[in-house]
Amino acid sequence: MNKPINLLVGGLTLFAAQGCKAPKQASQQAEHPNIIYVFPDQYRNQAMGFWRQDGFRDKVNFEGDPVHTPNLDAFARESMVLSSAQSNCPLSSPHRGMLLTGMYPNKSGVPLNCNSTRPISSLREDAECIGDVFSKAGYDCAYFGKLHADFPTPNDPEHPGQYVEEKRPAWDAYTPKERRHGFNYWYSYGTFDEHKNPHYWDTDGKRHDPKEWSPLHESGKVISYLKNDGNVRDTKKPFFIM
């Protein structure tokens, strides 16, 4: 088995897994590794226990928080950890706009947090996003969890002409297929911060209300995708997950 390559960057994680393959497949996989990009919602870099441990604390100019994060610590020990990666706009929507497009907020179309009173803030439809790039490179692309990069419109797939939530301004949003920028598998929502009572729209626009803590539920969905339960991805292709 080729050793997986893990990249841990502050509050985000990039995981490139190669796995067990025949020689020809291994060569192809080395050129197109499977990639899992994990990023939480505005996670504080200092709030990871390994920054207080030997081999890490002397690499940064801050003191890590006194937190207990054994799983992240173990992951860091198996990873390449970048000590100086940062966002120049660490705000929900603008950061996601930059992450997806590689552009500053004044160019990505997302200068502000997206809600129904801010039509000026929505991910540019003509932008080439990271999902577009990986899709064109032959990847099966999947997006899980919060997006919060679209201007909410009355496009509820189950109730045409209505927003997906009643409160105003509307913050949550449904992202139709034509705005998913290369992600062919979808299990996402706009923004809805009731993490013990989450909801999601799948690839076909069906809403799911799992009644489960969102990090646990989303992890389970990612694992299901990796196992290819229900034949949801093309196993002949490498995968890219966000």
Predicted segments — roles?
Residues 3-4, 11-12, 20-242:
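Formylglycine-dependent sulfatase
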